[in-house]
Amino acid sequence: MKYKIEKNTVQETLILPLYSRKLCTELYPNLYRDETAVHLLDQIDYDFSEAEKNSRSLMQRFGALEVAMRQNDLAWEVRNYLKTHPCAAVVNLGCGLDNTGRACDNGRCKIYNLDFPDVIALRQQLLPAGEREQNIPCDLKDPAWFDKIDASGGAVFFASGVFYYFLTQQVKALVQGMADAFPGGVLVFDAANRTAVKMIAKTWLRTAKIKDVGAYFAVSDAPKEIGEWDSRLQVTSRGYMLGYNDLKDPSVSGFFRFLAKAGDNGMKMQIVKIGFGGKL
């Protein structure tokens, strides 16, 4: 039986990123594979005709490459942390229907997937929690979820495409709260400069009738700007298109490599890594 998704629902906002990850898997098979996305979409009853039509456009194909690189980069950081903290908590902040935690499973870590209650309700149906895994309904801005994470073996948190929708003050409060609660832990997430965030936010800000884009989280020089928030933070960043992969794959055109360089350098598209006291 297929799970029906209606237009203009919260569920729809979760399906479209899944479709992007499936598109990545088809377009760039040497760079990225998300079998979960492919499998889940087979279980869903939804009209993908518009998404399929758009998938042929140049910018949609580049957007799929962006999604692929972002997911790969975050997974690389999670696996890197698990090398020195094999029993750590692996925490997906704003998980949607993303399965990165399970993809990074080393057989010993504890996996937590956090999102709003309506999102987790859908996730429980399509991606029920496995062994050593919990799906936790919460509001990320409310620190009550901190107590649900067993960080006795360390903790690595990651957020994909999440903080663009937070005010700068909200990100700062969350980061400082996490530094208190999870010393020795690491948070990794994608970010971009003000110009890029304005482009990302154009559609949803108009819908939400929000005028002050400048209050939303954006960063150009992460070590300097975020490092000033709290002396306990150890902040580094790498370009998210080319910082982890040179993209010299036959599936990626020279023009897309040019756009990737422009994204990393001009838009400051980056993966930010924050260590909370202790060693990174």
Question: Which residues make up each language-model segment?
Answer:
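Rossmann-like AdoMet
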Residues: 1-91, 95-138, 151-152
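A short, conserved alpha-helix within the catalytic core of class I
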Residues: 165-180
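A conserved beta-strand element that flanks and buttresses the S-adenosyl-L-methionine
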Residues: 157-158
